[in-house]
């Protein structure tokens, strides 16, 4: 289109077209036509090319956006698979909000923003090259002047802005994550902040962060506008300078032709160079924005990324027979130290728990009980020694017999959903018969849920806001029993219960002992008085074991 416009201007400005213009007119077969016919044909060609370009651009843009969006989803899934394949300590090495950002907004910044801008850059570079070639055919001097002038301005603006753009992107990302963390904190600690009348402290802190984010966004917007206006000023000043020089050195008709060609070429070259410069700034900005994601990708690429096992649906409780699994647990000379700490949390620990035993593990805070639980669950691995369940390490057992080991934490996490969905955690609730859930609720003394208007489909509220602490823990126990485990680990799971409910749960555990191995971590000795064996830990070691009466004595 730029070439056709340039040829039209050359034809208007001179009775005798230049050699290159005339050659092209001959190629089109209109060299002998009058000027009006030539301009009409050239205009029709230009309009046709422009319409075709618009439809082609729309089609390619649609394909590109869908391609990048799908790549974004695939990258998020791959990174999430790798994240969930890590040890718990590495997963918790980042804040929840930082992880969420890295897997969502950060991935979009990498694909839709960085890769998308890169593809647009390539298209604009090809556009400039094609237009420059056609412009060289019409007027070499104008082509050189236009490319040199606008390229110099574009390079200069990029060199002055790109570092600041990346810093602003990093700052905005950091503040975005921090503000999300603060919002989560104020919601989680609402009662404590209310009684202190300090909710306004968080409101002010979050408000200041959002203000800084807004300022960073405004600065980036100003940089984009600045580039646009500088390029427009360059077009005007460049046109005036070239015009003045041409009127001094050339006849008026030639000067008008050169100015016209420059303005037409500027109308195509300047916006393309501006888009390239803006695209490069966008890339640098989003490199800052995507830093958490890029760090995650770099970290995982060093280790290799393996996909997780395919997801299987619910196949009925008979599927959870765990044939061949033995719940015999041993620990041989096990030691463990947390990263960046010198003192061992578990030190030369020896353990032997027979299949079907009900074992209580007690000890003061900091004795290593919860760390031992994490080692048994395979979410962390011993630094020295070995833990074996059914003759293999816990991670292998979980892969071979999923659900054979179950866990009830000290504080059960409740998802935003129904009672049934919480018990079916990790499975589609719609695939599980209601009778299975009703039986589990009766086992854990939660029959009151059955009388609710919605029954087991009643909502638990935001993070279990409609439940008491004891109800949450019993849902956690029902969740653990859902997969018919052969080894059940409870980490102070009854500490939030009242004495009556704790007694009922303890009685239930006593009634099922022998059918599975039960390991109960407790502070209160009363919780483990019916255990077959009680283990006393202190300083990461087993200092004694025996019956409840023996240890109490």
Language-model features and meaning:
Residues 386-391, 420-461, 506-507, 515:
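ABC ATPase nucleotide-binding domain helical subdomain, centered on the C-loop/LSGGQ "ABC signature"
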Residues 84-129, 188, 212, 216, ...:
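Juxtamembrane loop-to-helix connectors within ABC transporter transmembrane domains
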Residues 406, 411, 422, 440, ...:
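ABC-family ATPase nucleotide-binding domain "signature/switch" substructure
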Residues 191-194, 198, 222, 268-301, ...:
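Cytosolic ends of transmembrane helices, especially the final helix of ABC transmembrane type-1 domains
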Residues 377:
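Helix-to-loop junction immediately C-terminal to a conserved catalytic motif
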Residues 120-171, 241-258:
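Transmembrane helices of ABC transporter permease
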């Amino acid at each position: 289109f730029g070439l056709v416009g340039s040829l039209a201007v050359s034809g208007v400005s001179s009775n005798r077209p230049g050699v290159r213009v005339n050659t092209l007119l001959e190629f089109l077969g209109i060299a002998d036509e009058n000027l009006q016919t030539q301009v009409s044909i050239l205009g029709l060609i230009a309009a046709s090319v422009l319409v075709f370009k618009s439809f082609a651009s729309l089609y390619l843009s649609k394909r590109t956006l869908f391609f990048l969006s799908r790549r974004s989803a695939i990258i998020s899934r791959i990174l999430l698979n790798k994240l969930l394949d890590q040890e718990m300590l590495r997963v918790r090495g980042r804040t929840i909000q930082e992880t969420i950002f890295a897997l969502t907004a950060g991935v979009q910044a990498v694909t839709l923003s960085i890769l998308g801008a890169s593809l647009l850059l390539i298209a604009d570079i090809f556009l400039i090259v094609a237009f420059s070639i056609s412009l060289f055919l019409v007027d070499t001097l104008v082509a050189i002047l236009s490319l040199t002038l606008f390229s110099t301005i574009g390079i200069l603006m990029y060199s002055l802005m790109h570092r600041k753009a990346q810093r602003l992107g990093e700052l905005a990302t950091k503040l975005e994550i921090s503000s999300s963390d603060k919002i989560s904190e104020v919601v989680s600690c609402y009662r404590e902040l209310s009684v202190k009348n300090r909710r306004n402290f968080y409101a002010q802190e979050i408000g200041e962060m959002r203000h800084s984010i807004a300022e960073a966004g405004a600065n980036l917007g100003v940089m984009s506008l600045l580039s646009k206006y500088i390029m427009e000023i360059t077009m005007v000043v460049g046109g005036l300078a070239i015009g003045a020089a041409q009127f001094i050195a050339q006849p008026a008709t030639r000067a008008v032709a050169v100015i016209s060609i420059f303005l037409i070429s500027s109308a195509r070259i300047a916006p393309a160079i501006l888009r390239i410069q803006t695209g490069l700034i966008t890339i640098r900005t989003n490199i800052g924005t995507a830093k958490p994601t890029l760090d995650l990708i770099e970290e995982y690429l060093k280790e290799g990324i393996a996909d997780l096992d395919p997801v299987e649906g619910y196949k009925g409780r008979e599927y959870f027979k765990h044939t061949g699994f033995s719940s015999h647990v041993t620990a041989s000379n096990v030691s463990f130290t947390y990263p960046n700490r010198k003192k061992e949390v578990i030190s030369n620990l020896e353990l032997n728990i027979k299949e079907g035993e009900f074992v209580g593990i007690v000890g003061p805070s900091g004795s290593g009980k919860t760390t031992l639980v994490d080692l048994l669950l395979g979410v962390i691995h011993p630094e020295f020694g070995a833990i074996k369940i059914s003759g293999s390490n816990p991670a292998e057992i979980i892969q071979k017999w999923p659900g054979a080991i179950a866990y009830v934490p000290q504080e059960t996490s409740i998802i935003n959903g129904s009672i049934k969905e919480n018990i079916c955690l990790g499975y589609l609730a719609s695939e599980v018969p209601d009778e299975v859930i009703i039986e589990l609720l009766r086992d854990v003394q939660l029959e009151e849920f059955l009388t609710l208007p919605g029954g087991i489909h009643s909502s638990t509220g935001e993070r279990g806001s409609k439940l008491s602490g004891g109800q949450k823990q019993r849902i956690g126990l029902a969740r653990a029993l859902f997969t018919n485990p052969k080894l059940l680990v409870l980490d102070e799971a009854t500490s939030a219960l009242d004495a009556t409910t704790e007694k009922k749960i303890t009685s239930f555990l006593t009634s099922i002992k022998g059918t599975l191995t039960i390991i109960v971590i407790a502070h209160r000795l009363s919780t483990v008085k019916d255990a077959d064996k009680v283990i006393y830990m202190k300083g990461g070691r087993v200092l004694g074991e025996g019956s409840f009466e023996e240890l109490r004595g």
